[in-house]
């Protein structure tokens, strides 16, 4: 649980930083005056609305002009506010004489959705009618990622057991990450099995549904609740067919086939007892595989006669051969350097014998140090200064 609590605390701290510049009482004053504040983003990506409040520099204001950074509250909004690991919608709010470009949406206090952005042109005023529209392509990419996270979560729990419960996530356009408790690195065979299982279910094109119900009903249905998340009496259950059921307030695709492809990229540690899987979904996953295919083709062309499945062994053999050649070359250079050094006559300076020499060949620092130590041991009361050049750099020992 320690790792899970750390992830939750990090998410809370990040959200607190995004609202630190505004006194919460300013938000509450807008919320108290608003007649209704409604999120319609599950069903719509654009809608008519009206501005219920504007904040600039952390203070409520009646209007804002081009160039102003503002926070706006609307009566009705299709914009999804960041939460549950899902990044916020981007888009625009257009008024009669002005337009705001929205690049962040937050809920600084429960029930209040705040849209943040810059007034790109004209002027906006409190109370005026506006048209709000989200970036549909971004939303679709994020929704794919969120549904993919649910499916990857379920697959890990099936394979590793119930301890592999989500301890954090981020759903971005075309990519996602998934954190979960684990005592050590997850074997590659498990990652391959998760990927195979999830993509197999994409082919089945399972229906993805979202249903509101009570917590009791959700538990009877077997829906998964995440540690550290807060739920009301009524909850929203997102189901991928009959396979994965999870309490979630995020946006999702309509069918699993819309994900196209899920590709797990990496698995790593992000803290004591917590592992992170990063992945791509949809077009981003296909682009990644296309790049990998081009790289593979290039390697097979470089290594004549090699089949793709033979590349790891062939490259490993080549690396070992190169290392052996480097060792032999180092031995040869050391022997050649020693012979060249034998021709150098020490210069007596008082009781000290000075041996200073610049080699005619390129020698690295290790070889120079070895030669210097051997020479110093051979000649008593000696000071040895050796130099060479290597890749246009002066090397001293």
Go through the PLM ranges and name each one:
Residues 3-397:
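A glycine- and charged-residue-rich anion-binding loop/surface
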